Amino acid sequence: MAVKAKGQPPSGYEPKVAEWKRREVKELKELMDEYENVGLVDLEGIPAPQLQEIRAKLRERDTIIRMSRNTLMRIALEEKLDERPELEPLLDYIEGPVAFIFTNLDPFKLYKLLEESKASAPAKPGDIAPEDIVVPEGPTPFEPGPIVSELQQAGLPAQIQDGKVVITKDTVLVKEGEEIDEKTAEILKKLEIEPMEVGVDIVAIVAEGTLFERDDLAIDFDEYEDMAKEAAQHAFNLSINAAIPTAETADVIVAKAHTEALNLAVNAGVPVPDETVMGCILAKAHGEMLALAGAIAEVDEEALDEELLEMVSRSAEAAERKEKEEEEEEEAEEEEAEEEEEEEEEEAAAGLGALFG
């Protein structure tokens, strides 16, 4: 008869699993059925009140953050892989204080929503500066006293001016990536500077079969929008200049071709049965004739008959009148600008007079 080792469970024995654990795994799997996109978020260092506020905002966008034990999260994922094999990569990210996030939102929109929900928070000893922490120039909330030497010992140019403690110039107290020590954290707290950012960060999310990490989602939407607009403009210009008609450019291409044909006909002096073209050709020829006649008149007026000489004279007078009108308009605009400037100065002076009696 086989001897059973001491402490070994009997054959066929199944460890008893708490009912709440079974229920938890079942609910996690149901959420994986209900939502298209499944991911993991980092909850480390988030105060409970703020986390509750973030979860409430996300629920309004049909997005659920579900916290559970890492072991149960793994079990739920593993049991769901037959139906949703694309979720398998998430198993590698279940470590530390993470939670599931279930959503039907586009992952980029979700990332933006989570970033917008973040808030500033005081620094704690041991925190790493997310960027240069700058103490700005100007007055502080402190009365003169021992605080001046505390600020100076921390590396801040503090002085007493007009009965107030003042920082005399912008100063980088902690550089990006450096650890914030206890003394510096206390100084920042006293100065009411909250350099840390607290919020939910995406660790990884699977959407439409693709795994996205946080860095994949951190794009500048404004920059991409500008790039898209620039690309659209280049495509529009290419379509017009290469005469490749599209629904958006056909009218412009036809108008451009018409203008170019008109210019060609006018400049080449090609008479065509079109009133606009013939009018432009005749006007151009008339102008060139007057210009040539004017040049001849400067050398020898007697070379022109009276009718042509009178036409040249009228043309010159018209040109002078136009030039004079343009000069008068320019002077009027300058005078108007000067008057507006004087009115603004008078209003400013009146305001100062009212302020100081």
Curated annotation (Swiss-Prot):
Note the subunit structure: Part of the 50S ribosomal subunit. Forms part of the ribosomal stalk which helps the ribosome interact with GTP-bound translation factors. Forms a heptameric L10(L12)2(L12)2(L12)2 complex, where L10 forms an elongated spine to which the L12 dimers bind in a sequential fashion.
Cellular component, GO, one term: cytosolic large ribosomal subunit
The root-end lineage is: Archaea, Methanobacteriati, Methanobacteriota, Methanomada group, Methanopyri
Q: Which Pfam families match?
A: Ribosomal_L10, RL10P_insert
Q: What is this protein called?
A: Large ribosomal subunit protein uL10
Q: Has the keyword RNA-binding been applied to this entry?
A: yes
What is known about what this protein does?
Answer: Forms part of the ribosomal stalk, playing a central role in the interaction of the ribosome with GTP-bound translation factors.
The record's annotation in SUPFAM superfamilies points to: Ribosomal protein L10-like (SSF160369)
The alphabetical list of record keywords is: Ribonucleoprotein, Ribosomal protein, RNA-binding, rRNA-binding
Residue numbers spanned by region Disordered: 311-357
State one molecular function term (GO).
structural constituent of ribosome
Which top-rank group of organisms is this from?
Archaea
Organism expressing this protein natively: Methanopyrus kandleri (strain AV19 / DSM 6324 / JCM 9639 / NBRC 100938)
Kindly list the biological process annotations in GO that this record carries.
Answer: cytoplasmic translation; ribosomal large subunit assembly
Q: Which PANTHER family match?
A: 60S ACIDIC RIBOSOMAL PROTEIN P0 (PTHR45699), LARGE RIBOSOMAL SUBUNIT PROTEIN UL10 (PTHR45699:SF3)
Family of this protein = Belongs to the universal ribosomal protein uL10 family.
**Where do Acidic residues bias regions lie?**
325-348
Q: Which HAMAP family match?
A: Ribosomal_uL10_arch (MF_00280)
Alphabetized CDD domains for the sequence: Ribosomal_P0_L10e
